């Protein structure tokens, strides 16, 4: 399934929403296998690839972030075997960096967020990222009282009895330690101890353990603490939770204090002031990795000064002041057997490489993305050469990588092994499904040619029509039980007019058409009286449907589930929405401006919606559909206790007590929506020195305006 995923840059918002739902469920399952059962099905690299895929989609479609997204939670729910422990401070995970460029961007982002010039004045620590089990050790009056796993980040498992058997973890702290101390770190099994344990298992004729990480985790969760004691587990301290007093004001100072208190800390941890120095140490640790007696999968960069950490704060699941720079994922060589072209619901022609099977990162790969025709030709998104201009041809020996994305990708070609007589791949200029012209649109604003070639057949194209119907009945749209992919394809291909479904309204006329038909659905293989009755009941149950589901089901390009909810909340009723979209047809005037002013609706999305409503075929389908179904009035959001919750805020001019990023993060944490432009939908404009046209427009519209001090007073500082 993963090999078939579309490149993120080619996804529509609807496709992105569908995949984010899949990734939320899939990553939750793997979290439970990894954290809860110590029995992972996939490698760490593949897990990181899934998470990175999720992050990339959310980065491109921020309005689609789900409440159950892996980016909004940490780890997995604790098991029922051990008593639950609620962490005094959440145990958050880290954002990942996958390249030197990502690491440099992290450093640059710190300076930018703090409003400082990148002058090398900010110190960062670098330390190996231990591949073990995260642990929180709580000391009260300098005695170890609780040891808990990370769990889901909020609630972990009480494994105190087992942790007491680990000799290098102090049971008591020295007199200078504060009354309440939570030390956080990683429990792991040394490679040498793991090898010795497996040697013992082999001598006894018992199954061998898979890897040190799983063995350490399983050893810690033994019901018999004597088993844990026999496994020679170890610990590195590197962070903290609740502290009744802070013994240092830097990250490095805290870790040095832990060492003085008797905790083992990693000797490779160092402090630097530039991205170049961070990366030099990263590559040094990477070279030393094979010689280390413990598994690591990257390094961690942290801002050293604790007061700067406090200013930088947190995202929903991770600190803004730290990142994990992962080591590169595995690459492999294989032969490109062919290139298939897939046609999606929006007509996008996507090339997929068919490969001789090869194992990459522990997974057998037979397909890989080729992104688009320019990528095949050796041209990047902005027109620059990639792979030094080397094109990809059928028959080539190619390099396949799984890193930073779920889809395996071809990253290069081995020119020395290119067979004689190969020819450059000719990307089709007609749809392989319906034969219609396939074109690359020109962006009216930039004048650039779209990287994606699209079929112009619209509903004439079977692939687009079928995929559109599948989208219409999908879970987040009309959610009609009994109309899955196979059933949609059957009804679409039927030659019987009483069975045929070619557009959405046909779904709701099926039962009426069948009443006078000689070809009864219940007599067709795969159906029966009971299943047909249930199908009709499911269809009729959807004759009244939420407005956001109705809008989402239309399959408008760039309009995913979250965008549909924004539109529904903004317009309230379909009558208002439909009339406004028709009125906005000239891409100007009040209706057009109102659409563009909705926070989360940019011009690209707005133009796609209006274009949809200008197409006569779409209007005919809509008219027929509205004869059969009734979109319900949208529910309006409930306000919270925050004085700015649900309000749209615009910051303009210079801010003197915080950076723009800090102000935005604070406003969003209080439930406000931050917009970049002023409109009738704006509630508050915060204006600092140098405020210009935005402040003028706010006054012209009679909006509430305030300066930075008034804003801070409103939100409580």
UniProtKB/Swiss-Prot annotation:
Cofactor: Mg(2+); Mn(2+)
Pfam families for this protein: BRCT (PF00533), DNA_ligase_aden (PF01653), DNA_ligase_OB (PF03120), HHH_2 (PF12826)
Protein's name according to its UniProt entry: DNA ligase
Tree of life domain: Bacteria
UniProt entry keywords in alphabetical sequence: DNA damage, DNA repair, DNA replication, Ligase, Magnesium, Manganese, Metal-binding, NAD, Zinc
EC number(s) given by UniProt: 6.5.1.2
Binding, Zn(2+): 431, 434, 455, 461
Residue numbers annotated as active site: 129 (n6-amp-lysine intermediate)
InterPro entries: BRCT_dom, BRCT_dom_sf, DisA/LigA_HHH, DNA_ligase, DNA_ligase_AS, DNA_ligase_CS, DNAligase_adenylation, DNAligase_N
Top EC class, one word: ligase
Any one GO MF annotation of this record: metal ion binding
GO cellular component, one term: cytosol
SUPFAM superfamilies cross-referenced by the UniProt entry: BRCT domain, DNA ligase/mRNA capping enzyme, catalytic domain, Nucleic acid-binding proteins, RuvA domain 2-like
């Amino acid at each position: 399934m993963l090999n078939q995923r579309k490149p993120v840059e080619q996804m529509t918002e609807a496709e992105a929403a569908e995949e984010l739902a899949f990734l939320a469920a899939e990553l939750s399952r793997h979290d439970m296998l990894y954290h809860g059962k110590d029995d992972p099905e996939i490698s760490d690299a593949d897990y990181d690839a899934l998470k990175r895929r999720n992050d990339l989609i959310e980065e491109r479609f921020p309005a689609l972030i789900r409440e159950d997204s892996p980016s909004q939670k940490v780890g997995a729910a604790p098991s029922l075997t051990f008593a639950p422990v609620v962490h005094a401070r959440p145990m958050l995970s880290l954002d990942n960096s996958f390249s030197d460029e990502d690491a440099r961007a992290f450093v640059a982002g710190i300076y930018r967020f703090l409003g400082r010039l990148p002058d090398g004045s900010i110190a960062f620590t670098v330390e190996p990222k231990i591949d073990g089990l995260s642990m929180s050790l709580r000391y009260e009056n300098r005695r170890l009282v609780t040891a808990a796993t990370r769990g889901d980040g909020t609630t972990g498992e009480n494994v105190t009895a087992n942790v007491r058997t680990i000799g290098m973890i102090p049971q008591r702290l020295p007199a200078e330690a504060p009354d309440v101390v939570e030390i956080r770190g990683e429990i792991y099994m040394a490679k040498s101890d793991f090898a010795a344990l497996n040697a013992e298992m082999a001598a006894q004729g018992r199954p061998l353990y898979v890897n040190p990480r799983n063995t350490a985790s399983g050893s810690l969760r033994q019901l018999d603490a004597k088993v844990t004691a026999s496994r020679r587990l170890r610990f590195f301290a590197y962070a903290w939770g609740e502290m009744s007093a802070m013994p240092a004001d830097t990250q490095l100072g805290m870790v040095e204090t832990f060492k003085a208190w008797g905790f083992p800390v990693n000797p490779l941890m160092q402090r630097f002031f530039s991205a170049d120095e961070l990366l030099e140490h990263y590559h040094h640790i990477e070279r030393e990795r094979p010689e280390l007696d413990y598994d690591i999968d990257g390094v961690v960069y942290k801002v050293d000064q604790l007061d700067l950490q406090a200013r930088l704060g947190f995202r929903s699941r991770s600190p803004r002041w730290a990142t994990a720079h992962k080591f590169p994922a595995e690459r492999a060589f294989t032969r490109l057997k062919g290139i298939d072209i897939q046609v999606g619901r929006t007509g996008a022609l996507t090339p997929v490489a068919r490969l001789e099977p090869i194992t990459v990162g522990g997974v057998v790969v037979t397909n890989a993305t080729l992104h688009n025709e320019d990528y095949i030709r050796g041209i990047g998104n902005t027109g620059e050469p990639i792979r030094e201009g080397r094109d990809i041809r059928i028959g080539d020996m190619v390099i396949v990588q799984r890193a930073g994305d779920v889809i395996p990708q071809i990253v290069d070609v081995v020119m020395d092994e290119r067979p004689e007589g190969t020819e450059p791949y000719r990307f089709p200029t007609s749809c392989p499904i319906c034969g219609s012209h396939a074109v690359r649109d020109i962006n009216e604003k930039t004048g650039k040619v779209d990287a994606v070639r699209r079929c112009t057949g619209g509903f004439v194209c079977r692939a687009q029509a079928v995929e559109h119907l599948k989208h219409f009945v999908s879970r987040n749209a009309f959610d009609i039980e009994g109309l899955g992919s196979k059933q949609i394809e059957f009804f679409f291909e039927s030659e019987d007019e009483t069975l045929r479904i070619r557009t959405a309204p046909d779904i709701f006329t099926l039962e009426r058409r069948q009443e006078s038909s000689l070809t009864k659905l219940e007599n067709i293989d795969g159906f029966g009286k009971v299943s047909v009755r249930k199908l009709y009941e499911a269809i009729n149950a959807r004759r009244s449907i939420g407005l956001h589901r109705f809008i989402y089901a239309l399959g408008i390009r760039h309009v995913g589930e979250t965008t549909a909810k924004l539109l529904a909340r903004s317009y309230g009723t379909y009558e208002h929405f439909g009339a406004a979209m028709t009125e906005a047809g000239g891409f100007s005037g009040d209706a057009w401006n109102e659409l563009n002013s909705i926070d989360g609706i940019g011009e690209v999305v707005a133009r796609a919606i209006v274009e949809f409503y200008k197409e006569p075929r779409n209007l005919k389908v809509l008219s027929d559909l509205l004869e059969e179904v009734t979109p319900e009035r949208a529910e309006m959001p409930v306000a919270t206790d925050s004085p700015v919750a649900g309000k749209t805020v615009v910051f303009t001019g210079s801010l003197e007590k915080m950076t723009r990023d800090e102000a935005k993060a604070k406003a969003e944490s209080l439930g406000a929506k931050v917009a970049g432009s002023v409109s009738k939908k704006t509630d508050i404009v915060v204006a600092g020195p140098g405020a210009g046209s935005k402040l003028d427009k706010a006054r012209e519209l009679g909006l509430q305006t305030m300066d930075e001090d008034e804003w801070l007073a409103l939100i409580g500082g």
